[in-house]
Swiss-Prot record:
Highest taxon of the lineage: Bacteria
Lineage of producing organism: Bacteria, Pseudomonadati, Aquificota, Aquificia, Aquificales
UniProt keyword terms in alphabetical order: Cell membrane, Membrane, Transmembrane, Transmembrane helix
Bilayer topology annotation: Multi-pass membrane protein
The keyword Cell membrane belongs to this UniProt entry's keyword annotation: yes
Species annotation: Aquifex aeolicus (strain VF5)
Protein name: Uncharacterized protein aq_1502
């Protein structure tokens, strides 16, 4: 009988529940968090390359919400403290076994979800998974696409090619531009790592590029017929519409308005010398109680993450996020695939990478962020083990 450690059980439970039920997932996050906090209090030490960033982000989130918007304190705990599961003390043996099963687990989940996604697309006109909406399905299938590509690269089984293209089509069906951007950036980052590792020849590189570019053109043509934002962009490119504020705001889904809202809030904080707000922000969902001069009454000032996060978490929270970005790309860009199992190791870093890119025009927090951080911790554990 296969025996698994407690940490392995938690890893599998978190991954599987992330695709089945957000409530179940959060239950496992809370359980993991309690174990982590107990361990921290007992041993009085934490480790991981993202530690400074997570501490700044989490503490500024909890403090600002407790002080300025206590009504949302529990949300502040969720967005801040839940990220502490990154500090779970993973061991090499635990992660090594998990990393080998992780790709096939994702592949199995991707196939199970497909009937659900296509049924909801047929029934409601939008592809959706078991829980969540088009954003989640876009993220899931960006991850699944990259998984099938890496599995093809390792196993050389051609069944992965049609699956890769099918999953790529689902990303375009989601019409989530942030996820399309995230997929292409992380995919080309993978090509870079493979090339620098001398695992990808010129012919293979250009063949993959041809498939991706062809898929992109097909996806763009489809979205240009179905999505008003792409239609507006095409009209501007073709000279049918002017490049003005109204059209830019339409293309950005109202984010231009929200960007101006956010900048005005920061400007007022500076003018009125609200140093605490500048330091730790106004709390999560600050848009629910703060002014909206441009008519956008959303609960968040969702535009470019630098402005969005500055308002909710201040300069400390923003610095924490920027630190996480820096350390992620530093670790990933320096990674080299020397052995076949290194492909499994690399895949553990992909979810956080996809999230970092897609969050540039939204917010850093996501319901599944604790899992992305923990998977990156697993990546670090195996990466550090390779050092002489």
């Amino acid at each position: 009988m296969l025996k698994m450690s407690r940490n392995e059980v938690l890893l599998y439970a978190l991954v599987i529940s992330a695709f089945l039920s957000i409530s179940l997932f959060e239950g496992f996050v809370i359980l993991t968090l309690l174990l982590v906090l107990y361990k921290i209090l007992k041993e009085r030490k934490i480790k991981g390359s993202l530690t400074p960033g997570i501490l700044l982000y989490s503490l500024s989130t909890v403090l600002s919400t407790a002080i300025f918007y206590p009504k949302r304190f529990l949300k502040g705990i969720e967005e801040g403290l839940f990220q502490f599961i990154y500090f779970l003390n993973l061991k090499k043996e635990e992660v090594k076994g998990f990393s080998k099963i992780f790709p096939k687990l994702l592949l199995g989940i991707s196939l199970i979800l497909l009937p659900v996604v296509f049924y909801k697309f047929y029934k409601y006109g939008e592809p959706k998974p078991i829980w969540g909406g088009t954003f989640e399905v876009g993220f899931f299938y960006a991850l699944f696409s990259i998984t099938t590509f890496l599995l093809f690269f390792k196993e050389r089984r051609f069944i992965y090619i049609p699956l890769f293209l099918l999953f790529l089509a689902v990303i375009f069906l989601s019409a989530r531009r942030s996820m399309m951007l995230a997929f292409f950036v992380i995919f080309y980052l993978i090509l870079f790592v493979l090339f620098k590792s001398k695992k990808l020849g010129k012919l293979a590189f250009w063949s993959v590029n041809f498939l991706i570019i062809l898929s992109f053109i097909g996806g763009y043509v489809y979205l240009s017929q179905k999505d008003h934002r792409f239609k507006t962009l095409n009209d501007i490119i073709l000279g049918k519409k002017e490049l003005n504020y109204q059209n830019l705001n339409s293309i950005s889904s109202g984010r231009l308005n929200l960007l101006l809202e956010g900048i005005s809030i920061i400007k007022e904080d500076i003018e009125n010398k609200r140093f605490i707000n500048l330091l730790i922000g106004h709390g999560v969902r600050a848009g629910e109680y703060m002014p909206h001069r441009y008519g956008m009454t959303q609960h968040r000032y969702e535009s470019i993450f630098i402005v969005s996060e500055f308002i909710e978490r201040g300069i400390l929270g923003l610095l924490g996020i920027l630190y996480i970005y820096f350390m992620y790309f530093k670790k990933v860009l320096s990674f080299r695939i020397k052995r076949e199992e290194d492909i499994y190791t690399y895949l553990l870093s992909v979810p956080l990478g996809l999230h970092l890119i897609q969050s540039v025009f939204t917010f850093f927090w996501d319901a599944l962020l604790p899992l992305y951080l923990l998977l990156f911790k697993a990546f670090e554990t195996l990466q550090d083990e390779r050092k002489p």
